[in-house]
Swiss-Prot record:
The keyword Nucleotide-binding applies. This is Aspartate--ammonia ligase. It is an enzyme of class 6 (ligase). NCBIfam families: asnA (TIGR00669). Its EC number is 6.3.1.1. GO terms for molecular function: aspartate-ammonia ligase activity; ATP binding; catalytic activity, acting on a protein; transferase activity. It catalyses: L-aspartate + NH4(+) + ATP = L-asparagine + AMP + diphosphate + H(+). Belongs to the class-II aminoacyl-tRNA synthetase family. AsnA subfamily. The gene is asnA.
Length: 327
């Protein structure tokens, strides 16, 4: 039966250790400045992240003006707008401590309706919009993960060390070709188990089979220049997503992707106009799950062991039977 390696109190202390180390190194190595972030945005701005395009945001109106507002799902689009508003230049970027509510999240060991992540975004030049630049950025972030594991091992040697020296890059099409009989999720399990750490490139568009590896909203990532960082989780014995990131859409890729998804109505939103008219800067960015990170590096079996959220009674009871104690 599962046994946590730390008490609840020890876990809370270690969570701070994880977050403080990672935040400091992320800012230094990607040359990012911390900024304040909104909990909600106006509906008409189009700044909310609609994730896979089907999740419902929490909506409410403001008494003063009647303006319709939405609790953010993530800050994928807001960050790009902020870089423009704050006058950042190529090579400069920002990050923020993002908190969100995703009401339609399917709850399980790795998913909660409460989301906390480091959301970051950086301005790039046109010639940087390449797979090589994407991979270079992934390697920088992976280096932070490696150093974090080493740092924690010095303080908590019982946590062990599991990350391989190198992260492997593979495209979603190569995965389909390698494992044609498996579902996309099972392909992720297979490749993560084989290598320990992988970055899957190209998520959102249809593969040669006609199926997508996974859904992505049409209006933030360029589907050819994005991907997910996955580790093999030693406790769960499954693939484990730490980050979704990518080079963002330019006017050409946004035009193509909105057409593919049948979302031409979004062309009238301020944010989308800013991209289509080449007003907003070209960027790369992503989200790095804070609770996910703590769950992996502290060897936890459930995300509820590293964050406070709301869980159905039957799920809490099931966890108790497995010796999993949720916050």
């Amino acid at each position: 039966m599962y046994q946590s390696l730390m008490t609840v109190r020890e876990t809370q202390i270690a969570i701070k250790e994880v977050k403080t180390f990672f935040e400091d190194q992320l800012a230094k190595r990607l040359e990012l400045f911390r900024v304040s972030a909104p909990l909600f945005v106006t509906k008409r701005s189009g700044l909310n992240d609609h994730l896979n395009g089907v999740e419902r945001p929490i909506e409410f109106d403001m008494l003063h003006s009647g303006e319709e507002l939405e609790i953010v799902h993530s800050l994928a689009k807001w960050k790009r707008f902020a870089l423009h508003e704050y006058g950042y230049e190529a090579g400069e970027g920002l990050y923020t401590n993002m908190n969100a509510i995703r009401r339609d999240e399917e709850l399980d060991a790795t998913h909660s309706i409460y989301v906390d992540q480091w959301d970051w975004e950086k301005i790039v030049q046109k010639e940087w919009r390449t797979v090589d630049y994407l991979q270079k950025t992934v390697l920088t972030i992976y280096g932070i993960f490696k150093d974090l594991e080493d740092h924690l091992f010095e303080k908590y040697p019982f946590l062990g060390k599991y990350l391989p020296e190198e992260i492997v890059f593979v495209t979603s099409q190569e995965l389909e070709d390698k494992y044609p009989e498996l579902t996309p999720k099972d392909r992720e399990h297979a490749i993560a188990k084989e290598h320990g750490a992988v970055f899957i490139i190209g998520i959102g568009d249809a593969l040669r089979s006609g199926e997508k590896h996974d859904g992505r909203a049409a209006d933030y990532d360029d589907w050819k220049l994005n991907g997910d960082i996955l580790f093999w989780h030693p406790v769960l014995q499954s693939s484990f997503e730490l980050s979704s990131m990518g080079i963002r859409v330019d006017s050409k890729s946004l035009d193509e992707q909105l057409t593919k998804t049948g979302e031409d109505f979004k062309r009238e939103y301020d944010f989308h106009k800013g991209i289509l008219e080449d007003v907003l800067p070209l960027t790369i960015g992503g989200g790095i799950g804070q609770s996910r990170m703590c769950m992996y590096f502290l060897r936890k079996a459930h995300i509820g062991e590293v964050q406070s959220s709301v869980w159905p009674d039957d799920l809490r009871e099931a966890c108790k039977k497995e010796n999993i104690h949720l916050f």
